Amino acid sequence: MTRRAAVKAPRAGAAARRGSVARRTKETDVAVDLRLEPGEASISTGLPFFDHMLDQISRHGGMALTVRAEGDLQVDAHHTVEDVGIGLGEALRQALEDKAGLARYGHAVVPLDEALVEAVVDLSGRPHLTFNAKLPSGKKFIGGYDVDLTQDFLQALVNHARICVHVNVRYGRNLHHVVEAIFKATARALRAATAREGTALPSTKGTL
């Protein structure tokens, strides 16, 4: 695995709405850069289906996103998927350093043919994930991607962005459709929650 020198992430300003993270361990080498504005996605994790899902986050989340990840895929994809979630969560937290004026809450219901998924987001500052998803039985892998890692990815994202996310898979038969709808719905809810509505902090406590 090629090693990169770790880069200290720049402090994200309120106006920039940008986060940049470089994270290297003995198992993975991950770099994430995002801006909370529509833009291009450039994704490379060594897992084509996961790349496709991260592209959905960029497109439907209304964010420019670059992800580069190299991991011990010869062992398992878990380390790579989870560490990308950690990096994306940390970058998102940087981009949301100033929460004044944000909508805070986001909700989306996304269909993909026969599948229907609901996602709700609260930029609460308190990490929580409810993942209510009974995935279709039988097939477990999509192009080398273990669908069980979807929950692990979201948990890492939630923990490091310090946000609250609820995902409810209402129904679906095709596993690809269900997983893709999970990513799209979560991205759409994030886009709504991170939208600017004014200047006030959306909390009676005075902090998030």
Curated annotation (Swiss-Prot):
Q: Which Pfam families match?
A: IGPD (PF00475)
Query: Cellular location of this protein?
Result: Cytoplasm
EC number(s) on record?
4.2.1.19
Q: Name one GO molecular function term.
A: imidazoleglycerol-phosphate dehydratase activity
**Which PROSITE patterns does the protein's record reference?**
IGP_DEHYDRATASE_2
* Principal localisation: cytoplasm
Query: Which superkingdom does the taxonomy of this entry point to?
Result: Bacteria
Catalytic activity, per the record?
A: D-erythro-1-(imidazol-4-yl)glycerol 3-phosphate = 3-(imidazol-4-yl)-2-oxopropyl phosphate + H2O
Q: Where is this region: Disordered?
A: 1-22
| BP terms from Gene Ontology | L-histidine biosynthetic process
Ranges of Low complexity composition bias in the record: 7-19
Return the broad EC class.
lyase
Q: What InterPro entries does the annotation carry?
A: IGPD_sf, ImidazoleglycerolP_deHydtase, ImidazoleglycerP_deHydtase_CS, Ribosomal_Su5_D2-typ_SF
Q: Name one GO cellular component term.
A: cytoplasm
Please state the pathway this protein functions in, per its UniProt record.
Amino-acid biosynthesis; L-histidine biosynthesis; L-histidine from 5-phospho-alpha-D-ribose 1-diphosphate: step 6/9
Q: Record keywords: Lyase included?
A: yes
| PANTHER family attached to this UniProt entry | IMIDAZOLEGLYCEROL-PHOSPHATE DEHYDRATASE, IMIDAZOLEGLYCEROL-PHOSPHATE DEHYDRATASE HIS7
The protein's name in its UniProt record: Imidazoleglycerol-phosphate dehydratase
